[in-house]
Amino acid sequence: MVEIRLTNTRTRRKEVFRPIDPQNVRLYLCGPTVYDRAHLGNARPVVVIDVLVRLLRHLLGADHVTYVRNFTDVDDKINATALARKEAGTPGTLEELIRERTHETIGWYHADMDALGAERPDHEPRATDYIGEMIAMIETLIAGGHAYARDGHVLFRVRSYADYGKLSGRSVDDMIAGARVEVAPFKEDPMDFVLWKPSDDELPGWDSPWGRGRPGWHIECSAMSYELLGESFDIHAGGIDLQFPHHENEIAQSCCAHPHGDFARVWLHNEMLQVEGRKMSKSLGNFFTVRDLLDQGIPGEVIRFVLLSTHYRKPMDWTAEKAREAEAVLRRWRGLVAGVEPAPGPAPAVVAALADDLNTAGAIAALHEMAGQGDGPGLLAGARMLGLLTEDLGGWIAEGPDLSALTERMAALRADAKASKDFSAVDALKQRLLDAGVEVRMSAAGVELLPGPDFDAAKLPE
């Protein structure tokens, strides 16, 4: 059995992954708050964890993995979006507009993630379906002295949990000293966070022992993961921006409500995304959603390839040049595997790279080597471990040009040139290929020809 090693944010070490129950590996990914389209940064953890799930199912069996990704469908941002629509004259009550918006946004999210080749999780719980479980968990926290009710709010008593701050490497006193926020009068301590808050008549709300209200964000994930995965499960994942306060708060409330469990054993966090070397933001004019890219004609498979080309723990820079290069590579690879059956399993080099802390860049390097060797079956099997070259994602491309004869011709000329030290024939063929829009890659692994965005079959040498 191949050993998987993952970098655990909680311990700050790369560790051998040892499932609690090898017959049922359980993992949870924080999903979207459904008020608007998913931007590219939202897609990165989805694609990364999709590869992890594929790896786990390959090694342990398809039926031995339970993957949960939630929808946060009760949130102030959702309320604000619906209120803006109501004020703009959209007919319907605020409650109806909120329901319409969340339903619409979940549909958008599914369509966009499907376009990136991300397989649907086993469970996609919606927060509003677990309100009763959240209330029960809050009652448990109050009974244990970890939470208190005041002015219609319920707050978690942060200092009641001695390990608070260990995930993010912060101390409570340092956090208070560095805070620049006005402390709400109903808080005992500035660091205490909301588990439940009151709702007025127009906003979504549910009856509770503390009056009509709605849950805080953090309790939602704790309640849903407990109900679907238990008090101890294997992996919790999300973007590094969620490490604090969201994940820190999840740990605190879950471990206090269920003191005999570990909550999540392994914490995986992907780094942030940049665009052309700068932070993605609306103020810089470089903010875009997954749908924006798809509507620009960038195929979902190309977006996926670019997302996987950088290790998940490194900041990822999206550039137009990377997208063009990815498209050229995928065109070449699809040409190589046209009409080919995949090998019985992915090459050991691909599996080994993914087992080493999800080194997707290393796995792609192994695929490049197979492509250079003309190993279509191996390339296809390995690429599918990454969710690439699948039938579902192939609709964007016509059947790729068959460059195998030219590849063999270049390889033969190159071999002769190495013996004779005369590379004139190699250079001449290379130039004609470049003129036809073909990228020529030559390495110790062999020759690889990739149709580029300016590819013109009419200019290919005969």
UniProtKB/Swiss-Prot annotation:
The cofactor note reads: Binds 1 zinc ion per subunit.
- A single cellular component GO annotation: cytosol
Question: Could you tell me the keywords of this UniProt record?
Answer: Aminoacyl-tRNA synthetase, ATP-binding, Cytoplasm, Ligase, Metal-binding, Nucleotide-binding, Protein biosynthesis, Zinc
Q: According to the UniProt entry, where does the motif 'KMSKS' region sit in this chain?
A: 279-283
Q: Which residues bind Zn(2+)?
A: 30, 221, 246, 250
List positions binding ATP. 282
| Origin: domain of life | Bacteria
In chain numbering, motif 'HIGH' region lies across 32-42
InterPro entries (UniProt xref): Cys-tRNA-ligase (IPR015803), Cys-tRNA-synt_Ia_DALR (IPR015273), Cys-tRNA/MSH_ligase (IPR024909), Rossmann-like_a/b/a_fold (IPR014729), tRNA-synt_1_cat_dom (IPR032678), tRNAsynth_Ia_anticodon-bd (IPR009080)
**The keyword Ribosomal protein belongs to this UniProt entry's keyword annotation:** no
Pfam families xrefs: DALR_2, tRNA-synt_1e
Q: Name one GO molecular function term.
A: cysteine-tRNA ligase activity
Location in the cell: Cytoplasm
Catalytic reaction equation(s) = tRNA(Cys) + L-cysteine + ATP = L-cysteinyl-tRNA(Cys) + AMP + diphosphate
State the SMART domains in the record.
DALR_2
Q: Which cofactor does it need?
A: Zn(2+)
Q: Which EC number(s) does UniProt give?
A: 6.1.1.16
Q: Which GO terms describe its biological process?
A: cysteinyl-tRNA aminoacylation
Q: Which CDD domains match?
A: CysRS_core
Q: How does it assemble?
A: Monomer.
Name the family. Belongs to the class-I aminoacyl-tRNA synthetase family.
UniProt protein name? Cysteine--tRNA ligase
Taxonomic lineage is: Bacteria, Pseudomonadati, Pseudomonadota, Alphaproteobacteria, Rhodobacterales
- Name of the encoding gene: cysS
